[in-house]
Design a protein with these regions (language model features):
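Bacterial N-terminal signal peptides that target proteins for export
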Residues: 1-6
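Hydrophobic helical h-region of N-terminal Sec-dependent signal peptides
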Residues: 7-12
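C-terminal motif of bacterial Sec signal peptides marking the signal peptidase cleavage site
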Residues: 14-17
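Bacterial signal peptide processing site
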Residues: 19-22
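Intrinsically disordered, low-complexity, compositionally biased regions/tails
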Residues: 24-25, 210
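Serine-esterase "nucleophile elbow" of acetyl-processing enzymes
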Residues: 26-88, 94, 98-106
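Alpha-helical cap/lid subdomain in secreted, periplasmic
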Residues: 71, 78, 94-223
Length: 223
């Protein structure tokens, strides 16, 4: 990201952490334990597993990235069902605490999107790495293909932390031979017109781009 983009995200994060700005309109969070509909839908499951960026904080439930991904799958003729297992505010540690609720669904693919809140809070990068590795390991042991969503953070904790954080995602992906989305918010982060008033969470239009970022990596796994 260029300097202006980084500065914009940094200011947005500071504003959010201080409680400033107008709050985004609320949306219902996804359940901590994903549910399977009782209509005997036998399509293979793709679970979107993450924090508020996955849950779709601030947008209509039909406009978040999991919902848009379902629409793209349907339009492309792929018979999969997307289950949104995003919970706002979660760190990688909290994701690890509930990874078993995803495994019991026996998903074909899990898109793992954690780390943004770790980086925002300046949590130890090594702890994030270990949590993410454990999540991926457990999901693969359950038979799922795993896609890791790469994250980037502004440099407010210094270059060493920022660079180390960015390296977590490709390194874990390489270790476990998992697929990697290089940057989940590529083309969205730092663009005010594609983000809500907090400067962090995408708008419905922003999620259109997020879905394309996901699709580039996910679609080859479905062929």
């Amino acid at each position: 990201m260029n300097r202006d983009v980084v500065l914009f995200i940094f200011l947005a994060l500071v504003c959010l952490s201080c409680g400033g700005g107008t709050k985004p309109k609320k949306s219902e969070p996804a359940p901590a334990v994903p549910t399977v509909s009782p209509n005997r839908d036998l399509r293979p499951i793709i679970v979107t597993f993450g924090d508020s960026l996955t849950a779709g904080q601030g947008v209509d439930p039909n406009m978040n990235y999991p919902a848009k991904l379902q629409g793209k799958l349907d339009a492309a003729g792929y018979h999969y069902r997307v289950v949104n297992a995003g919970v706002s505010g979660e760190t990688s540690s909290q994701g690890l605490d509930r990874v078993q609720t995803v495994g019991v669904l026996h998903p074909a693919v899990v898109i793992v999107e954690f780390g943004a809140n770790d980086g925002l809070r300046g949590l130890p990068a090594e702890a994030t790495r270990q949590n993410l590795a454990a999540i991926v390991s457990r999901l693969q042991s359950a038979g799922a293909k795993v896609v890791i969503a790469g994250m980037q953070i502004p440099p407010n904790y210094g270059p060493q932390y920022t660079i180390g954080f960015r390296k977590i995602f490709p390194e874990v992906a390489k270790k476990f031979n998992a697929s990697l989305i290089p940057f989940f918010l590529d083309g969205v982060g730092g663009r005010p017109e594609l983000n809500q008033e907090d400067g962090i969470h995408p708008t419905a239009e922003g999620y259109d781009i997020v879905v394309e970022n996901v699709w580039k990596v996910l679609e080859p796994l479905l062929r």
